[in-house]
């Protein structure tokens, strides 16, 4: 039995163990104190203070990375919550599109910085591009963005070539015809004028960026934007599906303005998301054609990117079932999945509408030429023949035609709503053909002479206007939609000398002046949807449903055309008045809205940013302040949605499909 436990036993170290422990302690002390002399000198200078300042400046981001800065922030007072929303949406878009937004594929075309070069070239007048001896290759891939670069000529070209060696891709692009972005274009006070024009052009470009970025933030991939409520909007013409109408409609405007990043975003969305397959959408044949088919065709002409040709054909094929009628006159609406087509119930007993079935020719004819498929041209030629052969009351075309019987509906004639763009496409089909489609020009002249005789009138105050004709009775009202006709008459005068030339130009100038008057007689300096003429009032809306303005472009279209044809400075001045009015009354923090009453000092906004505001309104204003060599009117013809299409025989960007010759059996 143990009296003392083992734990209480006293232990003794041997001398060898004591020496070993002491040696370890000495070594530790040497390492601790000696290491101080090996440290860098952080105390003999202000390094510690500088490190502290770096940490203080870093803020919380050193632990939580800050979100990326917004690329476009013109309004520094913007609510930080909205900035956060924008950043979250950017992340959503990037997740959807992958890394294409940051680094476009190599096939995506152009050398780095190409669009910056374009912006610099836009500041000075550029020469009209000379056509190449041979047309461009039909499909350029998606590498043809540099077509917007202005060619460098003469000594400047030599000096630039010596100081900036070019890649083979750049040399290839310079060998091809160019579509230059021009600048001023007036011999008077060029330095001052060019600076003013550049300022105005850049302002319109900034408006486009504002409209696009807010659409991207709040309605990306949807059809249109509601800026006030910051959510998507979709009109019935697009069905109930998300077709990216603003993307497709506005993309060529981005391209013309040289907005590369935004253009890439739109193109990538079209490639990845745009399709009419597997959706049961009831679409307007007319609206789908002028916006989607027309927009894709323009982008194909600009770039040679086969994506756009394929998409244009894809959309057109979805519209073809609407043409299956006894007369070949298409219905207004078609279901893209079932092919079932119909007309609007309100349209004069199930009739088709003149301005709709008569506004397909430019797109379908060009689509046949670039695909080699004659079907599309055949469809619109059938429409042409029906309208040519049918009896026309007093030489005029009523707005309604029954597609089953081939008989006119109500005898209502208009150069505004329901009729307008049919007459436009008669002249422009002739222009698009290189002035070889004489049938179209003859039909245009016959129609215009009847309109001049039966519908064009002059008010007591000397204002020229186009009235509506209903059952042989004039309605002294002019639609805003009819304001395009000022440019139409002028273009008809400028492209052929005949007995009507002077009258066409006189009426074109008069109508454009009248539409300007409808703007400046409103407190907002923006024109109403329709305006009337009587002994008591001229160029003013009287009914509440006529007093709104929905960002329409027709008046600015005529300013643009008249400027190009006359170089009368007043058209540019009028255009700038419109820019200021749009900025004052239609701009919001999140886009642009129409107005419910242009006669109120502080009008209520309608909360819709129309896709045509980007496609037409801003494009025409931008071109109004650009050089004539930017989309010259003798090389390009604009469809009714302002999508420019090349003129055959005058423009190397026509990109007609090669003709396949029959194989000979001869040995």
UniProtKB/Swiss-Prot annotation:
Q: In which tissues is it expressed?
A: Complex spatial distribution during embryogenesis, including expression in lobula plate giant neurons. Also expressed in adult wing and eyes.
The cofactor named in the record is: Ca(2+); Mg(2+)
Q: Which stretches are transmembrane?
A: 19-39
Glycosylation site residues = 278
Span list, region Disordered = 154-192
GO BP terms = carbohydrate metabolic process; determination of adult lifespan; encapsulation of foreign target; ERAD pathway; protein glycosylation; response to anesthetic
Q: In which pathway does it act?
A: Protein modification; protein glycosylation
The name of this protein is Mannosyl-oligosaccharide alpha-1,2-mannosidase IA
Name of the gene this protein is made from: alpha-Man-Ia
């Amino acid at each position: 039995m143990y009296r003392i436990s083992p734990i209480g036993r006293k232990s003794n170290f041997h001398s060898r163990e004591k020496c070993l422990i002491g040696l370890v302690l000495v070594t530790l002390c040497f390492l601790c104190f000696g290491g101080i002399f090996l440290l860098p000198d952080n105390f003999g200078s202000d390094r510690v203070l500088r490190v502290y300042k770096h940490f203080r400046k870093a803020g919380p981001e050193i632990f939580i990375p800050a979100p990326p800065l917004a690329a476009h922030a013109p309004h520094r007072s913007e609510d930080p919550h909205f900035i956060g929303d924008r950043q979250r949406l950017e992340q959503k878009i990037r997740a959807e599109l992958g890394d294409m937004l940051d680094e476009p594929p190599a096939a995506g075309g152009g050398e780095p910085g190409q669009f910056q070069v374009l912006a610099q070239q836009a500041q000075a007048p550029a020469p009209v591009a000379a056509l190449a001896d041979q047309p461009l290759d039909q499909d350029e891939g998606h590498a043809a963005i540099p077509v917007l670069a202005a060619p460098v000529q003469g000594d400047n070209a030599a000096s630039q070539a010596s100081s900036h060696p070019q890649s083979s891709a750049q040399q290839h692009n310079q060998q091809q015809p160019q579509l230059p972005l021009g600048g001023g274009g007036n011999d008077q006070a060029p330095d001052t004028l060019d600076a003013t024009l550049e300022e105005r052009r850049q302002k319109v470009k900034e408006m486009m960026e504002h409209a696009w970025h807010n659409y991207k933030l709040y309605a990306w991939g949807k059809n249109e934007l509601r800026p006030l409520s910051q959510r998507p909007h979709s009109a019935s013409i697009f069905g109930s599906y998300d077709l990216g109408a603003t993307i497709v409609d506005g993309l060529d405007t981005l391209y013309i303005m040289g907005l590369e990043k935004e253009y890439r975003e739109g193109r990538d969305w079209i490639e990845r998301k745009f399709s009419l397959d597997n959706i049961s959408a009831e679409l307007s044949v007319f609206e789908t054609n002028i916006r989607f088919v027309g927009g894709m065709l323009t982008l194909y002409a600009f770039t040679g990117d086969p994506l756009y040709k394929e998409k244009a054909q894809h959309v057109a094929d979805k519209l073809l079932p609407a043409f299956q009628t006894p007369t070949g006159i298409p219905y207004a609406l078609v279901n893209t999945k079932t092919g079932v087509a119909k007309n609007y119930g309100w349209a004069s007993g199930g009739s088709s509408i003149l301005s709709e079935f008569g506004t397909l020719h430019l797109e379908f004819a060009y689509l046949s030429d670039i695909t080699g498929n004659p079907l599309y041209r055949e469809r619109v030629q059938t429409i042409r023949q029906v309208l040519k052969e049918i009896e026309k009351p007093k030489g005029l075309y009523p707005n309604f035609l029954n597609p089953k019987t081939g008989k006119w509906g109500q005898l209502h004639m208009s150069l505004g709503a329901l009729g307008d763009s049919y007459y436009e496409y008669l002249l422009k089909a002739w222009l698009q053909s290189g002035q070889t489609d004489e049938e179209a020009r003859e039909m245009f002249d016959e129609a215009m002479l009847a309109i001049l005789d039966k519908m064009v009138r002059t008010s007591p105050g000397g204002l020229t206007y186009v009235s509506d004709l209903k059952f042989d009775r004039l309605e002294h009202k002019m639609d805003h939609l009819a304001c395009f006709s000022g440019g139409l008459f002028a273009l008809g005068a400028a492209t052929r000398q005949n007995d009507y030339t002077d009258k066409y130009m006189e009426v074109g100038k008069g109508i454009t002046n009248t539409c300007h008057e409808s703007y400046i007689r409103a407190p907002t300096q923006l024109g109403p949807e329709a305006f009337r003429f009587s002994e008591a009032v001229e160029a003013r809306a009287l009914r509440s449903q006529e007093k709104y303005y929905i960002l329409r472009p027709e008046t600015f279209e005529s300013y643009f055309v008249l400027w190009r044809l006359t170089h009368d400075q007043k058209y540019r001045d009028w255009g700038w008045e419109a820019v200021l009015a749009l900025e004052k009354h239609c701009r919001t923090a999140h886009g642009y809205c129409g107005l419910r009453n242009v006669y109120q000092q502080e009008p209520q906004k309608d909360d819709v940013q129309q896709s045509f505001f980007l496609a037409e309104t801003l494009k025409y204003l931008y071109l109004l302040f650009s050089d004539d060599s930017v989309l010259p009117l003798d090389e390009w013809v604009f469809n009714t949605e302002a999508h420019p299409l090349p003129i055959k025989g005058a423009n190397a960007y026509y990109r007609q499909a090669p003709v396949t010759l029959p194989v000979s059996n001869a040995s």
